[in-house]
């Protein structure tokens, strides 16, 4: 069982640092651990943030779109990203200087995100600046909800993370709400088509900001984080009732 964080088990908030998993989501994930072979959160957030914001022992954490993972309580960065960490830091400095009125989020040195949720009229200008800075530093720009992120140009995304997590499993579910989750959906579809997964379920966590493609590709749609929490609780309850 694999889930996204923001907008899936946590509400979308103006200040990214204040986001926390819904208490009912914590309980449901804790109940699922031991029932599923793997219960994981696959997110664009740093794993140390996820550990604090979710606080569920035994949960597998993959962050930074697959560039970071938690191992034995320690954040481990993909070695392929390390040569670009200096460029990420320099880009963050420039973005803070050029966009002083917007939130520039430094993500444990691995990525940097510019947010305009509280200033929606600044979106176009922010995108122009972010893309220019990305080009100057050899980084890649990605669109997210009311934000744009710079990452190392490394072939890693939620899809590659999901492929590693489900390797050898007979089935997998992934739940997400944003454009970056489409890569996870595509990975499950590829694995199922290749016969590497017997069952693959893609769950769209709907909202007014959810991409149309996400809803179109989903096998199941739920209404926001509360809807996903209800589904997770149903799965946990069904597993408890099923004889072993």
Question: Language-model segments: what does each one mean?
Answer:
Residues 8, 47, 180:
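Conserved Rossmann-like nucleotide-cofactor binding loop
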């Amino acid at each position: 069982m694999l889930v996204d964080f923001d907008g899936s088990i946590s509400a979308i908030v103006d200040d990214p640092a204040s986001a926390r998993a819904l208490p009912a989501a914590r309980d449901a994930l804790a109940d699922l651990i031991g029932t599923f072979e793997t219960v994981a959160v696959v997110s664009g957030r740093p794993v140390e943030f996820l550990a604090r914001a979710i606080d569920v022992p035994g949960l597998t954490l993959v962050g930074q779109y697959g560039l970071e993972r938690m191992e034995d309580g320690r954040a481990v960065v993909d070695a392929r990203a390390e040569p670009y960490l200096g460029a990420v830091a320099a880009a963050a400095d420039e973005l803070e200087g050029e966009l002083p009125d917007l939130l520039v989020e430094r993500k444990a040195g691995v990525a940097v995100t510019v947010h305009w949720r509280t200033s929606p009229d600044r979106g176009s200008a922010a995108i122009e600046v972010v893309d220019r800075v990305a080009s100057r530093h050899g980084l890649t720009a990605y669109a997210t909800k009311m934000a744009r992120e710079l990452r190392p140009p490394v072939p890693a995304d939620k899809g590659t993370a999901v492929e590693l997590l489900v390797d050898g499993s007979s089935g997998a579910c992934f739940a997400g709400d944003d454009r970056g989750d489409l890569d996870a959906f595509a990975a499950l579809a590829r694995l199922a088509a290749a016969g590497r997964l017997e069952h693959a379920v893609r769950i769209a966590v709907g909202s007014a900001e959810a991409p149309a493609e996400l809803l179109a590709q989903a096998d199941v749609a739920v209404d926001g984080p509360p809807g996903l929490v209800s589904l997770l609780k149903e799965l946990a309850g069904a597993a408890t009732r099923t004889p072993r």
